[in-house]
């Protein structure tokens, strides 16, 4: 079994296990994170893997490649991601936006040399962020409990299902040649991780409890993406509400040098 197949099967197994076997985990007081005991354990595991393997590779990657090259790599993968954005824009009935995103993809794939240069943004075509988790939210499916996925990081029950669906619109995952697929996948993961190196320093200074900080930031961002930055009706807002917790009442996070990165596969 190759790397991408192993990761895909591992994610499926993790989601199924979480959906069927975790109801008995120790509960905390936050209704949006009833699996907090389990999630903190996975968070600590992810952080350990990141500290031992991914972060050093990302640091070396940034040290070797100049900023202009890293920007080009990021643009390349962002352009491929527009395929997922277009599909989910259509599924959310955002036809004008999806048309604009299709224009972005065509322009950057041609004039922008396979996306290495973000020509479309210079021409006024805005970059959007859409995925199947947001599509489910658009059609009224609640986020469900917060979830930390092994290796993949912050998620929710809805977004975990959406992540699996997004595999089928991910251009990298559809490449038949295993060597190219794995090379591109690995490069994307490392490039994404390198972009978090500066952010994590701010997190370590600002957050008393890294786990709670990452969780709340993730949930707030996902609500904003589903809402497209607008307020929803009171019932929907209440469904995704995350009450503030006093820092003193939160259990200490597992010692770590950085939060586990959220990497889009």
Language model: regions and residue ranges:
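Bacterial Sec signal peptide processing site at the extreme N-terminus
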Residues: 20-41, 51-53
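Beta-rich strand-turn-strand
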Residues: 74-76
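A structured, mid-to-C-terminal "fold-capping" secondary-structure block
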Residues: 26, 139-265
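N-terminal secretory signal peptides that target proteins for export/translocation
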Residues: 1-6
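Membrane interface segments of multi-pass transport proteins and intramembrane proteases
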Residues: 52-69
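Bacterial N-terminal signal peptides
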Residues: 10-23
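Mid-length scaffold segments of soluble, non-membrane domains
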Residues: 79, 86-157
């Amino acid at each position: 079994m190759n790397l991408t197949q192993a990761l895909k099967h591992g994610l499926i197994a993790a989601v199924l296990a979480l959906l069927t076997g975790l109801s008995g985990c120790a509960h905390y007081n936050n209704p949006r994170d009833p699996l907090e005991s389990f999630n903190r354990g996975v968070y600590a595991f992810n952080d350990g893997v990141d500290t031992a393997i991914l972060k050093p590779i990302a640091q070396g990657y940034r040290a070797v490649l100049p900023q202009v090259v890293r920007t080009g790599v990021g643009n390349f993968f962002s352009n491929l991601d527009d395929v997922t954005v277009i599909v989910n824009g259509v599924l959310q009935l955002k036809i004008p936006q999806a048309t604009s995103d299709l224009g972005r993809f065509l322009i950057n794939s041609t004039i922008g040399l396979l996306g290495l240069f973000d020509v479309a943004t210079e021409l006024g075509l805005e970059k959007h962020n859409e995925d199947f988790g947001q599509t489910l939210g658009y059609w009224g499916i609640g986020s469900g409990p917060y979830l930390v996925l092994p290796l993949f990081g912050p998620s929710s029950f809805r977004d975990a299902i959406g992540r699996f669906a997004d595999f089928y619109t991910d251009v990298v995952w559809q490449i038949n040649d295993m060597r190219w697929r794995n090379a591109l996948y690995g490069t994307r993961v490392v490039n994404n991780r390198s972009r978090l190196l500066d952010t994590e320093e701010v997190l370590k200074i600002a957050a008393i409890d890294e786990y709670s900080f990452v969780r709340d930031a993730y949930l707030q961002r996902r609500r904003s993406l589903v809402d497209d930055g607008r307020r929803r009706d009171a019932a929907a807002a209440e469904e995704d509400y995350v009450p503030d917790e006093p820092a003193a009442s939160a259990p200490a996070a597992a010692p770590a040098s950085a939060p586990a990165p959220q990497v889009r596969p």
